[in-house]
Amino acid sequence: MLDAMVKKALFLLISLLAATHQPMKAENKVKNPETEWSDENERSLPSVPQLSIDEQNLYIRSSVELTNLDVCIRDSRGNIVYSDSHYIPAGGMTVIPVASFNEGEYTLFINEGSKYVIATISIN
């Protein structure tokens, strides 16, 4: 009889834990940035855009005005999942929604003229 009660209690405990368990979610990350943002003939751009990401959005910040910033995101198969041009005022940012992206690795290409940033972003 004690065995049956222990089994019942254990079953209830496991059921309760399974019902309330929230899956752990790792933070999305920007990894492996590669930049070529300084050209010998274009010294007027003093800083590379800063990238950050959370579970909903990718943020691109810049301390200088970027007037025609092309942003392209490709999935692991090379398919374009996002492509658009952006304007970022000095000290401003642009926001790109990533909440609808499937889990996985994506390659981010950002360029303005001959200057570029390539980074890997991880969506978890």
Question: Where are the model-predicted features located?
Answer:
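Transition segment at domain starts
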Residues: 22-53
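Short edge beta-strand/loop segments characteristic of extracellular beta-sandwich folds
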Residues: 56-63
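Short proline/glycine-enriched turn/loop motifs at strand-loop junctions of beta-rich domains
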Residues: 64-68
